[in-house]
């Protein structure tokens, strides 16, 4: 099993090209099922979850051609299977996003209950309840969600009991082919949801309220394929910016989307960074200074993203002063904390809050990645640890970061993949 070895780094310097957003690419790949003609995506990252999504689409009978250079073509002309099996779904929660498209276009879907990162329950009941409101008959049996509808799904007025990115995406895709108007209230406003909506509109969907908490979808009878470019990955961007801040460096992120990162950029400025940006780039400069501790509280977009929480725990661990990091989205999302404590971090958990007293250096150690973003935080920690840090179980990293070691190497870090 692959591991990463990391040596203490000089300040990171240089430029890094940001990949397409995993959390936008996965639902957009599933949206390909809705299209009656060929669908071509670009800026798709080379990731394990993307590969799993392509396998799932092929398993259903779709033709999926990886054209190179981050381009994928999908044809559903011969799609004739409607079951997403456990073997594929168990490794990736986003597999649940095939449910809405299959049901909306073909009237039937059997989807195994999902797996993915072990960061809490993340129930699928919001997905199912919304689809039932649109006329679907659903039962959960022997580990599978079995959904059927006679004819087309029907437009409905859906109020989400809690904000859910995945449920918003599933219902948005289903509503695009429903009969009548669907209104989704308390919808997730994440940029990746907006990216999916823009893709659906390019396919012929009628959606208003994009980027707000109320989405209105006027269902159409059919959708066509299109060419669409996936948005840049704001979490990958934030990860590299935090790494630069922790190492007191100066970097430039190309192919970035500053507009989707206001909460993160504001906290980096609070930490003492000079942040400048253009339409598709962001520069961060620490001027050689140690960052200052910041207080973080995760919440749905446009507030601070839960997917950047672990990285900012490391920033606070190596900052001047004391910072508090409060997690409100997922339970059990501080699994990186015991590993960071093993590296010498001064951290204490009080319920959903981690209180962190900053120090100058950590100590290299063998640590274990427990989920995707925790993995990234351990890599950043290794850049400011004396000696060698060995990060085990990096298959989590490969689910969400494209060529992470080579990108860090391009910024001057000693991050090496070993068997």
Curated annotation (Swiss-Prot):
Q: List the catalytic residues.
A: 117
- According to its UniProt record, where is this protein mainly located? cytoplasm
Q: What is its EC number?
A: 2.5.1.7
| UniProt record, GO biological process | cell division; cell wall organization; peptidoglycan biosynthetic process; regulation of cell shape; UDP-N-acetylgalactosamine biosynthetic process
Q: Which protein, by its recorded name, is this?
A: UDP-N-acetylglucosamine 1-carboxyvinyltransferase
Provide the binding site for UDP-N-acetyl-alpha-D-glucosamine.
93, 307, 329
Which Pfam families did the record assign? EPSP_synthase (PF00275)
Family matches, as NCBIfam families: murA, PRK09369.1
Cell location = Cytoplasm
GO CC field: cytoplasm
- Swiss-Prot/TrEMBL keywords: Cell cycle, Cell division, Cell shape, Cell wall biogenesis/degradation, Cytoplasm, Peptidoglycan synthesis, Pyruvate, Transferase
Cystines in this chain: none
Pathway annotation: Cell wall biogenesis; peptidoglycan biosynthesis
For this protein's source organism, the top of the classification is: Bacteria, Pseudomonadati, Pseudomonadota, Gammaproteobacteria, Alteromonadales
Q: What role does this protein play?
A: Cell wall formation. Adds enolpyruvyl to UDP-N-acetylglucosamine.
Q: Which reaction does it catalyse?
A: phosphoenolpyruvate + UDP-N-acetyl-alpha-D-glucosamine = UDP-N-acetyl-3-O-(1-carboxyvinyl)-alpha-D-glucosamine + phosphate
Any idea which residues bear 2-(S-cysteinyl)pyruvic acid O-phosphothioketal here?
A: 117
Organism listed in the record = Shewanella denitrificans (strain OS217 / ATCC BAA-1090 / DSM 15013)
Q: Which GO terms describe its molecular function?
A: UDP-N-acetylglucosamine 1-carboxyvinyltransferase activity
Which residues make up the binding site for phosphoenolpyruvate? Answer: 22-23
């Amino acid at each position: 099993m692959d591991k990463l070895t990391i040596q203490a780094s000089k300040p990171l310097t240089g430029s890094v090209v940001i990949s397409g957003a995993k959390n936008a690419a996965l639902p957009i790949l599933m949206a390909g099922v809705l299209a009656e003609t060929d669908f071509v995506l670009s800026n798709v990252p080379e990731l394990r979850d993307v590969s799993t999504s392509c396998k799932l689409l092929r398993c259903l009978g779709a033709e999926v051609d990886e054209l190179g250079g981050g381009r994928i073509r999908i044809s559903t002309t011969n799609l004739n299977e409607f079951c997403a099996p456990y073997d594929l779904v168990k490794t990736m929660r986003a597999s649940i996003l095939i449910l809405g498209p299959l049901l909306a276009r073909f009237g039937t879907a059997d989807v195994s209950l999902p797996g993915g990162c072990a960061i809490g329950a993340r129930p699928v009941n919001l997905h199912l309840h919304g689809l039932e409101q649109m006329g679907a008959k659903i039962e959960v049996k022997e580990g599978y969600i079995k959904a059927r509808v006679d004819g087309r799904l029907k437009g409905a007025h859906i109020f989400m009991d809690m904000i859910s990115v995945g449920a918003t995406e599933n219902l948005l895709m289903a509503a695009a082919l429903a009969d009548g108007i669907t209104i989704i209230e308390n919808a997730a406003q994440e940029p990746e949801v907006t990216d999916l909506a823009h893709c659906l509109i390019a396919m012929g969907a009628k959606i208003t309220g994009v980027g707000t908490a109320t989405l209105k979808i006027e269902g159409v009878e059919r959708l066509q394929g299109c060419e669409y470019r996936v948005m840049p990955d704001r979490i990958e961007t934030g990860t590299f910016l935090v790494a630069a801040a922790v190492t007191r460096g100066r970097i430039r992120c190309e192919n970035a989307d500053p507009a989707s990162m206001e909460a993160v950029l504001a906290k980096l400025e609070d930490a003492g960074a000079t942040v400048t940006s253009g339409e598709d780039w962001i520069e961060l400069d620490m001027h050689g200074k140690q960052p200052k501790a910041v207080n973080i509280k995760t919440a749905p977009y446009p507030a601070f993203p839960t997917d950047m929480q672990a990285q900012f725990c490391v920033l606070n661990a190596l900052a001047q002063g004391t910072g508090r990091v409060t997690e409100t989205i997922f339970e059990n999302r501080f699994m990186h904390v015991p590993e960071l404590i093993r590296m010498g971090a001064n951290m204490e958990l009080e319920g959903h809050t981690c209180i962190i007293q900053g120090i100058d250096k950590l100590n290299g150690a063998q640590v274990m990645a427990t989920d995707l973003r925790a993995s990234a935080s351990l890599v950043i920690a290794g850049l400011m640890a004396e000696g060698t840090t060995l990060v085990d179980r990096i298959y989590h990293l490969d689910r969400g970061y494209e060529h992470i070691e080579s990108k860090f190497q391009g910024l001057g870090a000693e991050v090496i993949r070993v068997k």
